[in-house]
Amino acid sequence: MANTPHGGVLKDLLARDAPRHDQLAAEAEILPALTLTERQLCDLELIMNGGFSPLEGFMNQKDFDGVCENCRLADGNVFSMPITLDASQKTISELKLQAGSRLTLRDFRDDRNLAILTIDDIYRADKQKEAKLVFGGDPEHPAIKYLNNTVQEFYIGGKIEAVNKLNHYDYVALRYTPAELRVHFDKLGWSRVVAFQTRNPMHRAHRELTVRAARARQANVLIHPVVGLTKPGDIDHFTRVRAYQALLPRYPNGMAVLGLLGLAMRMGGPREAIWHAIIRKNHGATHFIVGRDHAGPGKNSKGEEFYGPYDAQHAVEKYKDELGIEVVEFQQVTYLPDTDEYRPKDEVPAGVKTLDISGTELRKRLRTGAHIPEWFSYPEVVKILRESNPPRASQGFTIFLTGYMNSGKDAIARALQVTLNQQGGRSVTLLLGDTVRHELSSELGFSREDRHTNIQRIAFVAGELTRAGAAVIAAPIAPYEESRKAAREAVAGSGGNFFLVHVATPLEHCEKTDKRGIYAKARRGEIKGFTGVDDPYEAPANADLTVDVSKQSVRSIVHEIILMLESEGYFERL
């Protein structure tokens, strides 16, 4: 028999409201509508299917305050993470929202109506309270950054009536709702289930620790990875799910099942661990593995951990009696080469040789194509990871040249394009400033805002091409540090590699060699907002390479760029 849901009853709103579907669908068409963000969609799905039981909607102020201050809903149930629906004052005013209003919640991906929210209250988001009490207060924490940079100024609280399920087109058979997973466990005859949460690929050590946990408790294993929103830079869920599927046959037959969880993680450490335990309880698990630094975001810019290594375990232990799910404390396992086995580190006798490969080392080996031993991971898993994470010699990159007009960046870009084409191995795309202005940004002017927009368009194109394995050479003026930083983040965020080259040719040289007389026109006032004349150029603070055409030949500069790429592994090494 599966575990009792949190709060006693599974709040499966989809099943509850199915008899009224036609009525609710018709009403949703005529109500004011709010189009949800990706994170809001993840939250809504788990509200509607009961994954967030006992919630029946987005939190009102009483629930929000109780969760932030005491880890409890207003009804007294333990709940550790604020589940809120944020909206701007502009949206609230335009839709004429107030307490008692009914609001359609819409999917941004396909414009489908998913639910109707009856508004209980609209309250100002106390971001400072949420940041401090829920996430610890460090402004570098990703959840706090999201609060400060993305979340709107008001929260809308109220209960949900479900209209339609979210559409998914990937791994549909593995996306069990809590009710479906409970039925599946019952069909298999499972009464004791250890749930394992992960946002990373699984290797031999993970298989070993989950089997050990199941063996000690005479239980089965639910591999329950997150496929919603995880930490930026994580391996994509498509790759991870293929790797989980490849790993599954390595378990004893009938021991483990794989189910996917469309959760938007907050990387909230102790608070998140409690939340994860509640979610797994709602999915029918009786036991939940909580690891070292569970759901922690890593380190801040000072190299400090956001949470203590065992804070998450202590937090779940504090509420274990009320949570109603047994916590299995993750004991890190290590490989013993002399006996070809894995053991928990605290069970290894002194002096016995052990081997480990860190996540950083694994990423390095994937990047360079170095050997990944079978004692660490299974060949079928490594094969999948290599397919999605090719070595650098097969990856794309963006060379972003910035400098004054006539600094020589266009000449460098063209020469570099020829050199890379001769090198072969990847397609090469050239994005010169004038070309982009003509083809992509013809409607933009030269205000600071328009210049920023132009650079972001270049970054978007560069990121998509780089992710597909191409070499991109961009050569805009890009005078503002803010725009260049955003461009780097955009390319890196899409999985690409970005190199900023500052063509630091002095302004005097650029003017002196200007055969088109454009600087002269700007000096006479015939051209306004001209970089270097009446608009500033902010020199890069973090260029990967700085060159100067007044002191170096184009050929030598291109050679410097090639050497930089070679040193980073972007060309085949014999």
UniProtKB/Swiss-Prot annotation:
- Active-site residue list: T198, R199, N200
Question: Which reactions appear under catalytic activity for this entry?
Answer: sulfate + ATP + H(+) = adenosine 5'-phosphosulfate + diphosphate
**Keyword Amino-acid biosynthesis on entry:** yes
Molecular function terms from GO: adenylylsulfate kinase activity; ATP binding; sulfate adenylyltransferase (ATP) activity
Map out region (Catalytic) in residue numbers.
170-394
List residue numbers at the site (Transition state stabilizer). H203, H206
Q: Where does sulfate bind?
A: Q197, R199, A295
> Its Gene Ontology biological processes?
cysteine biosynthetic process; hydrogen sulfide biosynthetic process; methionine biosynthetic process; sulfate assimilation via adenylyl sulfate reduction; sulfate assimilation, phosphoadenylyl sulfate reduction by phosphoadenylyl-sulfate reductase (thioredoxin)
| GO-annotated cellular components | cytoplasm
Q: What is this protein called?
A: Sulfate adenylyltransferase
Provenance organism: Aspergillus niger
